[in-house]
Amino acid sequence: MANTASARKRIRQNERRNARNTARVSRMRTFVKKVEAAIASGNKDEATAALRAAQPEMQRASGKGVIHANTVARKISRLSARIKSIVAA
């Protein structure tokens, strides 16, 4: 248990931040799942629209420091490549 007032305050801050960050990651994952579902259905237009909606959410999570910027770039790149492969097939 925290002994000092500042340590108790830090615990409160960490709990709030943890809840906020968890919500951000969850929201981002939901958007990514929508993109993956659209890719699985084979609908290129739907997948493109879903990626267009997911991209700002992913970048926002990166900007807030929830996940690393390179991770977001890699995920966006891989999703884009999968959408392009729908067109080629």
Swiss-Prot record:
Residues 1-24 are annotated as: Disordered. The keyword rRNA-binding applies. Keywords: Ribonucleoprotein, Ribosomal protein, RNA-binding, rRNA-binding. InterPro entries: Ribosomal_bS20, Ribosomal_bS20_sf. GO terms for cellular component: small ribosomal subunit. GO terms for biological process: translation. It comes from the Bacteria. One of its GO terms (molecular function) is structural constituent of ribosome. This is Small ribosomal subunit protein bS20. It comes from Gluconacetobacter diazotrophicus (strain ATCC 49037 / DSM 5601 / CCUG 37298 / CIP 103539 / LMG 7603 / PAl5). The gene is rpsT.
